[in-house]
């Protein structure tokens, strides 16, 4: 965190600097004009985590300032959603006088939604007992008078859930409301407003598509579910078990009938597509029955490995969302040998930081 950088009056200037840097970094690919999708300048983060500082009878949140190299008391947090900012003092007011709940509490995580749900995770440097559970239930009841809240208690090899370890987000995407189960400790897009813009951009970029879609790294089905109407069938892969389970829930709740998700890594899927190895996890799915003209990838910061780049290169259309423009640039050195960039976008998921989310649509030359 850089506390001095979080000034809404400076937001446009910071965004312009990101746009200029991204445009210059990718100029040699001769992309079309950069499409820019800004964030709200405040209250855009749906999830946050704070350390908890004990000072006598007082108890407060703190974060580490990377520039000043010191902890900063954080009673309110500008980037956090308004719901998180309302919950922050309400929770502390309950915790301060309650020894069972505050004893050796060292961190609080918040996961909120635009739909009004919030999940609070309390992390401890001690084992949790029946007294903690009793007090936590009472805490949930009191907070529940003002919030739609669930609580999780975590300690080493312990996890108590009151009553759910997930929230259900509702996003209005291109005139349609999509519902997403988001599980604690699983990846979700932190900036819901920009996440909607990313989904709408991806929908627009693929609206003239034919055939089927393959997605690697699908998470909870965030993109697959939104993009499904643009394709005959969608096949998606994800390795993390909680994300796969959430994706299956999301498929059902959104009534998507043309999407299958398999629990495999991108590397394993590459082996399966080449026929090098048969995976029982594929079940009855016949890979050869898919006519995937388009592939969608949203890889981790490390980007695509060499074998996956070769796999991706075999598709006519490539939609690539990147949380690390440096590794996107590396991957494009190979992909640009066979494909050209026809859409180029910046999504400002993380205002007031150097992080930039980029999107490119490539078509075979």
Swiss-Prot record:
Family annotation (InterPro entries): MeTrfase_TrmA_AS (IPR030390), MeTrfase_TrmA_CS (IPR030391), SAM-dependent_MTases_sf (IPR029063), TrmA_MeTrfase (IPR011869), U5_MeTrfase_fam (IPR010280)
PANTHER family, per database record: TRNA/TMRNA (URACIL-C(5))-METHYLTRANSFERASE, TRNA_TMRNA (URACIL-C(5))-METHYLTRANSFERASE
Keywords assigned: Methyltransferase, S-adenosyl-L-methionine, Transferase, tRNA processing
Single Gene Ontology MF annotation: tRNA (uracil(54)-C5)-methyltransferase activity, S-adenosyl methionine-dependent
UniProt EC number: 2.1.1.-, 2.1.1.35
Keyword tRNA processing among record annotations: yes
Residues at the catalytic site: 323, 357
Gene symbol of the encoding locus: trmA
Record has Membrane as a keyword: no
HAMAP family found in the cross-reference section: RNA_methyltr_TrmA (MF_01011)
Binding site for S-adenosyl-L-methionine: 189, 217, 222, 238, 298
Substrates-to-products reaction catalysed: uridine(54) in tRNA + S-adenosyl-L-methionine = 5-methyluridine(54) in tRNA + S-adenosyl-L-homocysteine + H(+); uridine(341) in tmRNA + S-adenosyl-L-methionine = 5-methyluridine(341) in tmRNA + S-adenosyl-L-homocysteine + H(+)
Its job: Dual-specificity methyltransferase that catalyzes the formation of 5-methyluridine at position 54 (m5U54) in all tRNAs, and that of position 341 (m5U341) in tmRNA (transfer-mRNA).
UniProt protein name: tRNA/tmRNA (uracil-C(5))-methyltransferase
GO CC field: cytosol
Species the sequence originates in: Shewanella amazonensis (strain ATCC BAA-1098 / SB2B)
